[in-house]
């Protein structure tokens, strides 16, 4: 059968961009269909603009610490921050798709090889679904009459609100809570769990939670929102404890929903699982082998870097025979929370290792015991590594300055099944925060030297 294109990609977020740009570079006939903006949520209303906000907020905090709080000195105007964010978006997407035809329309399946958009039908041998997710609004009394902020609208504010309630305690909630607090907004976080960052390392999450509270962020844990209403003064939220919270704005950051309803997946024979994820196998194929689902829509890992990686793997698998295809589940996924301090993790967590009965050792080095961290006034934090019986590196958690860069070394170690001695004999630049990773290996080794038999062996070889 002759097709109009080799490949049609629906959605141009991180996953769709990877598929479309790489496919075109490989000589394939590619058509990309995007409903809104190139870059998807990450580039336009997610990880990229949020880092611009965080950067501005950190500068304000640094200025306050260096100069002292000067009464009446306002934070930088939000419109200047927004202008910078617009500049980032323009620079990021400019000229990227000169060689890839892009159609800005809503797409849906006619059948398993045919996609319709804007009244036109096009066929392809391979089709990639990369539609991502969108923010979930709370289902509480009065919610339909309240204008919630989400990450999709937060960066369009004309000014920093005087106060804001944030529903949720995950990455988006935490990053925006700290950023807006440092920019002069009074923040109250409402979190159903016993702490924020409930999926992360407990010690690291509690360190960040206390840091937030020290900066003036109010955190209500073990609390559920029951009802909400719009008042003349702004927002009134009633919790399950009966407390009434008042603020100028409210941000919903407590969940995500899938964004493929308009695709008519049933026309293509593409199935979803009980949780709504598009069902994929280890090669990222859906229930139709020539249709792939990449990124958030398959529910595997809701991270932009994971989406990009899946796009690359799926494109390779679409071209290769089965025996050469790659299992996307075998690649570790590091994750970083861009709070201050940053929190990064990769591999097995301490909780999972204990729950599965794995025999392992936890090695910890604290920033406060490292001269460079003290000198740079970033002494809050630690590096924690989980080492198996044979010395294999099973996972790592880093909370502190630069952890988002440091975690990549540990991701390579976990994926390649390296042993802690591999890091011990790897020279690290000094004095950098990354040197703390080598300190972990040194600490592990020094503990071995405490054993009497080891000391005897050392003395024996020294006398030869």
Spans of features found by a protein language model:
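Glycine/Thr-rich phosphate-binding loops of Rossmann-like dinucleotide-binding domains
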Residues: 18, 124, 137-139, 175, ...
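Catalytic nucleophile loop
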Residues: 16, 170-173, 307
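A Rossmann-like FAD-binding core segment of flavoenzymes
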Residues: 101-104, 108-116, 184-282, 355, ...
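FAD-site-proximal beta/loop scaffold in flavoenzymes
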Residues: 144-161, 244-322, 409, 424
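Glycine-rich dinucleotide-binding loop and its adjacent helix/turn
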Residues: 47, 131-190, 218, 266-268, ...
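Glycine-rich flavin
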Residues: 2-5, 14, 21-28, 33-160, ...
């Amino acid at each position: 059968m002759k097709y109009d294109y080799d490949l049609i990609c629906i959605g141009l977020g991180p996953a769709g961009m990877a598929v479309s740009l790489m496919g075109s570079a490989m000589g394939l006939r590619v058509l990309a269909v995007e409903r809104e903006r190139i870059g998807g949520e990450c580039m336009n209303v997610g990880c990229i603009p949020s880092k611009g906000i965080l950067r501005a907020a950190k500068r304000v905090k640094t200025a306050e610490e260096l100069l002292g709080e000067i009464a009446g000195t306002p934070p930088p105007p939000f419109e200047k921050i927004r202008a910078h964010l617009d500049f980032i978006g323009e620079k990021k997407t400019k000229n990227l798709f000169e060689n890839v035809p892009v159609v800005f329309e809503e797409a849906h399946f006619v059948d398993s090889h045919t996609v319709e958009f804007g009244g036109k039908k096009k066929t392809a041998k391979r089709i990639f679904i990369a539609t991502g997710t969108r923010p979930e609004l709370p289902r509480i009394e009065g919610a339909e009459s309240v204008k919630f902020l989400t990450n999709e609208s937060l960066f369009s504010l004309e000014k920093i609100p005087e106060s804001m309630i944030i529903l949720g305690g995950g990455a988006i909630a935490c990053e925006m809570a700290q950023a807006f607090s440092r920019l002069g907004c009074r923040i109250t976080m409402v979190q159903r769990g016993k702490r924020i960052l409930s999926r992360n390392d407990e010690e690291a999450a509690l360190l960040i939670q206390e840091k937030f509270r020290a900066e003036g962020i109010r955190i209500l844990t073990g609390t559920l929102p029951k009802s909400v209403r719009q008042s003349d003064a702004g927002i009134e939220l009633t919790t399950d404890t009966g407390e009434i919270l008042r603020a100028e704005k409210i941000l919903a950051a407590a969940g995500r929903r899938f964004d493929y309803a308009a695709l008519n997946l049933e026309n293509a024979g593409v199935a979803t699982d009980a949780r709504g994820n598009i069902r994929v196998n280890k090669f990222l194929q859906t229930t139709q082998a020539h249709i792939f689902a990449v990124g958030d829509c398959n529910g595997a890992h809701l991270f932009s870097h994971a989406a990009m990686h899946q796009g690359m793997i799926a494109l390779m698998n679409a071209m290769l025979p089965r025996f050469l295809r790659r299992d996307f589940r075998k690649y570790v996924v590091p994750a970083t929370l861009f709070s201050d301090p940053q929190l990064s993790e990769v591999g097995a967590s301490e909780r999972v290792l204990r729950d599965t009965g794995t025999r392992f050792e936890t090695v910890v080095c604290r920033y406060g015991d490292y001269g460079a961290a003290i000198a740079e006034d970033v002494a809050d934090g630690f590096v924690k590594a989980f080492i198996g019986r044979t010395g294999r590196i099973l996972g790592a958690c880093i909370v502190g300055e630069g952890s988002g860069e440091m975690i990549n070394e540990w991701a390579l170690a976990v994926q390649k099944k390296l042993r802690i001695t591999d890091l011990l004999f790897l020279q690290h630049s000094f004095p950098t925060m990354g040197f703390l990773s080598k300190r972990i290996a040194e600490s592990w080794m020094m503990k071995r030297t405490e054993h009497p038999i080891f000391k005897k062996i050392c003395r024996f070889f020294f006398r030869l």
